[in-house]
Amino acid sequence: MRQCRTISASMERPHSPKTPSSPAAADTLSALLEDLDAEPRDFDCIVTGDLGHIGADLLLTLLRGDSIDLSPVYSDCGSLIFGDEQDAHAGGSGCGCSAAVLCGPLLRDMHRGKIHRLVFAGTGAMMSP
């Protein structure tokens, strides 16, 4: 197991509430897969709390740089709630989106046997720009 640490990456939009979470989420998910000696396909779904479309795209790009392709099993709660129609590029509230999706459709699908192996990584901004 890795020691706890702070992940901070240089980026074009450091004050965006979602993009700072993406490098930390990438590090966490990469470490989890390594620790479990697993591949993304070993899970039914891998879900982040609320990176929104912008942060989710960055997460997938960062992990592809490490030869990890989450795209077949990856979803983001903020992106699921807001979709493409609402123009919420960076999603909403990490804790709100996480709770709504985890306690709603994800746990319901687990209870019904549609999801057996789930990775849920709570993400979202913890900052006040």
Language-model regions, residue ranges each:
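Condensing-enzyme catalytic core mediating Claisen C-C bond formation in acyl metabolism
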Residues: 1-30, 35, 72, 79, ...
